[in-house]
A protein has these predicted regions:
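A short, flexible helix-boundary coil/loop motif
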Residues: 1-6, 11-20, 139, 143, ...
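Gly/serine-rich nucleotide phosphate-binding loop at the start of the catalytic core
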Residues: 1-58
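Short, conserved catalytic/metal-binding motifs centered on acidic residues
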Residues: 43, 87-97, 126, 169-177, ...
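Electropositive, glycine- and tryptophan-enriched low-complexity nucleic-acid-binding patches
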Residues: 58, 113-168, 264-269
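An internal, acidic/charged active-site-proximal segment
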Residues: 144-252
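Long, acidic, intrinsically disordered low-complexity segments
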Residues: 249-290
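Short amphipathic alpha-helical "interface-anchor" segments enriched in bulky aromatics
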Residues: 278-312
Length: 349
């Protein structure tokens, strides 16, 4: 069981002054205690002193503390508790609908989850995930919608988490099926990477994978995986084939196909490329399922702790709010039982 006080001490260890540690804890406790939208006014009221509203507002949007240091402490805290080598990083895009353009980074963009154009923010989040736990760690707000913007955001996040932890946990990137142009070229060399790609991306595969070719053909990933799926007994709805990018680059790679319902047949629903060493198909399949769990965490606990609730034009304010809301998510995930007992005790009193 994780003690909440010890958890806060670990998260806020890099704040230089006691005042910042107090404000950070107030803000996180307010995020955990407020029902409904997590405005600064509601957060201040939840922690018992509405007069703290201006102090908390300045702490988030006007103070000089580094959100990177807090994110680093959050990453260190959750990976240490998971145990050496356990877990993976998951990089996932999210859409945050907003009413009007009064907040930073608001654009009109297509939201795959809602299957329509929405007005709101687009962001990428880096989450730490094990089979039991999920915690958001770091964020990038997109200021444009081009592929270049998205690739840059992915690259920054992958580089960041690799540097913060200094380990080689796999990084799973599901940026909405980016084509493989240069999804994360430099970070690919720093940590094992698994990237969801467009099913039509060309891969160099062994001749026996695609019938009728004497030399190593270049085939669409979905075709190669459909062929190998017919030739082998796939595990839990996944099949793999050794592959390489025709133009060279990182390698050797494994292409992974994922089929719905646990049965291989026809065109795969998802295609992934991986350089995770010595990974079995079932292990790669487990990694490929992590983004769905993260998306569920974003919709449920993420909404409950206010990850989508920041209002304001300050980009530093957005980053600080997202970081503190990520800390609130971690506290609820790691010490939720203790929180419930505290709430029950308050209600009984």
């Amino acid at each position: 069981m994780t003690d909440i006080s010890e958890l806060y001490a670990s998260l806020f260890t890099d704040f230089r002054g006691a005042t910042h540690r107090v404000r950070a804890r107030q803000y996180v406790e307010g995020l955990l205690g407020v029902d409904g939208r997590k405005t600064v006014a509601n957060i201040a009221a939840a922690v018992g002193d509405p007069q703290d509203e201006q102090r908390l507002r300045r702490f988030v949007s006007g103070a000089a503390w580094s959100w990177d240091l807090l994110r680093r402490a959050l990453a260190r805290t959750v990976t240490t508790r998971a145990g050496e080598g356990r877990g993976a990083w998951v990089v996932l895009p999210v859409s945050i609908p907003k009413n009007g353009d009064r907040s930073v980074g608001v654009t009109r963009h297509y939201c795959p989850e809602r299957e329509r154009v929405v007005v709101g923010q687009q962001a990428f989040g880096a989450w730490f995930a094990t089979q039991e736990r999920l915690v958001p760690i770091s964020w990038r707000l997109l200021r444009g919608s081009s592929e270049t913007d998205r690739v840059a955001a992915v690259r920054e996040l992958v580089t960041e988490v690799a540097e913060w932890t200094g380990d080689r946990r796999p990084v799973v990137v599901d940026p909405g099926a980016l084509p493989v142009t240069d999804p994360a070229r430099q970070p690919w060399e720093r940590c094992p990477l698994m990237v969801r790609v467009d099913a039509g991306v060309g891969l160099a595969v062994a001749p026996q994978v695609v019938p009728g070719h004497a030399a190593a053909p270049v085939a669409p990933a979905s075709q190669a995986l459909t062929s190998v799926g017919r030739l082998s007994v796939a595990s839990r709805g996944v099949a793999t084939v050794p592959a390489a990018l025709p133009a060279g680059g990182p390698g050797p790679l494994t292409a992974l196909g994922v089929w719905p319902g646990g049965r291989v047949g026809g065109r795969p629903e998802e295609v992934w490329l991986s350089d995770v060493p010595a990974a079995r198909p079932a292990s790669l399949g487990a990694l490929a399922r992590l983004p769905r769990r993260v998306a569920g965490g974003w919709r449920t606990r993420g909404a409950a702790v206010g990850l989508a609730d920041f209002e304001g034009r300050s980009l530093p304010g957005w980053h600080r709010h997202m970081t503190l809301a990520s800390c609130a998510y971690a506290v609820d995930e790691l010490a939720g039982d203790q929180l419930e007992r505290q709430r029950s005790g308050l209600c009984a009193a």
